[in-house]
From Swiss-Prot:
Gene3D superfamilies: Tubulin/FtsZ, GTPase domain
The keyword Isomerase is annotated on this UniProt entry: no
Protein name: Protein DML1
Organism of origin: Candida glabrata (strain ATCC 2001 / BCRC 20586 / JCM 3761 / NBRC 0622 / NRRL Y-65 / CBS 138) (Yeast)
Disulfide bonds: none
Signal sequence region: none
GO annotations of cellular component type: mitochondrion
Location relative to the cell: Mitochondrion
Entry's Gene Ontology BP terms: mitochondrial genome maintenance; plasmid maintenance
Gene assigned in the entry: DML1
Origin superkingdom: Eukaryota
Family: Belongs to the misato family.
Length: 484
């Protein structure tokens, strides 16, 4: 058994993790003769030998702001003594209950689950918290809460310092210092240690995070220490990228324009991308469409996240792969190329493009080829189907590989507009557009980050990353100046 632990860092990341584990839960009720997946890879089994039953909890460590868990208490389903509503008849007689914030009522969906009743239909208004629709019971050690930062339902991705509406968790350096100063020792010695004890042979981690705000600095600091502690494991980083002046420029075909707020956003993005991509074996820059809520984003991205991870837990040993295999396959012999630049879900009726780099304005090239044609360094197709795929034998040429895995089984918590058919193909590509992004980032640092101590280190790191994705000849004057 080769377990995978998911570490989700931010409210938005927790929505994706929740949708993923809800999909894992639906597979537990698969009544077919041959199970398609091994639940123990992503879920931790607890065996009750008296009742001869098995219960499962996610192999997960969730980070969120205070009250970000909604109505869910850490010990709500294991020990009720820390969790009260207005009726406190069972509270300890030797102490007083201190209420530090208004009680968040349990969602109708959770009440229905507890009572064994039909669940109500989900929408944006009743899914403000990821816990509103979580179907599995998490271990208390899965929950990690920022002590001084509070969740704000009006701005859920940027916690509020002590709920004073005065300071936001919106800078890379704030998140980085927050982890290093307050959580480094406690996290590794307690909750992470407990999660590791539940694993027999851990193969790696999925790190899900935001990078436009303080969570990018927080997850970067966490991953650096995690990699130092467990250097032999494999790390996949899933980084949510919000819309910014680059994506606006791409969409509207206009010049890139920055103000103070968006320049800070890009600075956060660059620092988090540099750190996470260096420490990860694969870095997946997911685009977070501002038109969707966090619940909808989790629903939209789940086929991508679930699809790649389905390769890791299939019961068919001929089709199952591990995280190291996937990372080496997509790096294709060069461990400096760790970034997935394109990830498309392909069905008969449509194609969904999941990644941020596909929405980035393109620099000019000396080559006479069309600027949209990027050189492909490696490509992996993951075909999902519950039927035997005779025509899709695994391809083993240098740049294009194909992997077959079992079909997608979405949970009822997925938004109706994103409930996909079980059969589809994921196309993951590492190509030359990464150079385009990092050259633009380098131009940004040169123009807008003038006095930071790490300025030269950032420029060198960005230049080195860009050079890893070069192919052919470029103009000496090749830069993104014309976009500004």
């Amino acid at each position: 058994m080769h377990e995978v632990i998911t570490i989700s860092v931010s409210q938005r990341a927790n929505h994706l993790a929740t949708q993923f584990f809800n999909c894992r839960e639906t597979l537990l009720y698969d009544n077919t003769k041959d199970k398609v997946n091994d639940p123990k890879i992503f879920l931790n089994p607890t065996i009750d030998r008296i009742s001869k039953t098995v219960s499962y909890s996610p192999r997960a460590l969730l980070w969120d702001a205070k009250t970000g868990n909604g109505s869910l208490g850490s010990y709500q389903y294991s020990d009720g003594s820390d969790y009260y509503f207005k009726n406190d008849d069972d509270k300890p007689s030797d102490g007083d209950l201190m209420q530090t914030h208004p009680v968040i009522p349990k969602s109708d969906y959770q009440r229905a689950l507890d009572a064994g009743l039909p669940e109500p239909k989900l929408n944006n208004s009743n899914t403000k918290y990821w816990s509103d629709y979580a179907r599995l019971i998490y271990q208390p050690s899965s929950f990690n809460i920022l002590r001084d930062w509070y969740h704000d339902t009006d701005n859920p991705n940027r916690p509020d310092f002590k709920s004073l509406k005065d300071r936001r968790f919106d800078k890379f350096i704030i998140g980085e210092e927050e982890f290093k100063s307050n959580y480094l020792v406690d996290f590794f010695d307690t909750n992470l240690h407990h999660e590791l004890e539940q694993c027999d042979t851990l193969q790696g981690f999925n790190i899900i995070t935001d990078i436009d705000n303080g969570w990018g600095g927080f997850s970067s600091a966490l991953l650096v220490e995690l990699r130092n502690e467990l250097p032999k494991n494999t790390y996949f980083s899933w980084a949510f990228h919000e819309s910014d002046p680059y994506t606006v420029s791409y969409t509207r075909n206009t010049k890139v324009q920055f103000n103070k707020k968006t320049a800070e956003q890009i600075s956060n993005k660059i620092r988090a991308t540099t750190s996470l991509s260096q420490e990860s074996d694969l870095f997946i820059p997911v685009y977070s469409d501002p038109e969707y809520s966090n619940w909808e984003i989790g629903s939209l991205v789940c086929p991508l996240f679930d699809g790649l991870n389905s390769v890791l837990d299939g019961t068919d040993t001929e089709k199952r792969r591990n995280m190291q295999y996937l990372s080496e396959l997509l790096q294709n012999g060069d461990n400096n190329r760790k970034i997935i630049s394109s990830a498309n879900m392909i069905r008969k009726d449509r194609i969904i493009d999941y990644l941020y780099y596909s929405r980035f304005p393109t620099q000019s090239r000396k080559s006479s080829s069309a600027v949209s044609e990027f050189h492909v360094f490696s490509k992996c197709n993951i075909s999902r189907s519950n039927k035997e795929m005779k025509d899709n034998a695994e391809i083993k040429n240098v740049t294009n590989k194909q992997i077959n895995t079992y079909g997608y089984k979405f949970a009822d918590t997925v938004s109706d507009q994103f409930k996909e058919d079980s059969n589809y193909k994921l196309c993951l590509t590492s190509d030359e557009r990464c150079r385009n992004v990092f050259k633009e980032y380098g131009d940004f640092v040169s123009k807008y980050i003038k006095y930071d101590d790490d300025r030269e280190d950032m420029k060198n790191s960005l230049e080195n990353t860009a050079s890893a994705y070069e192919f052919g000849w470029y103009d000496d004057s090749d830069s993104g100046d014309d976009n500004y």
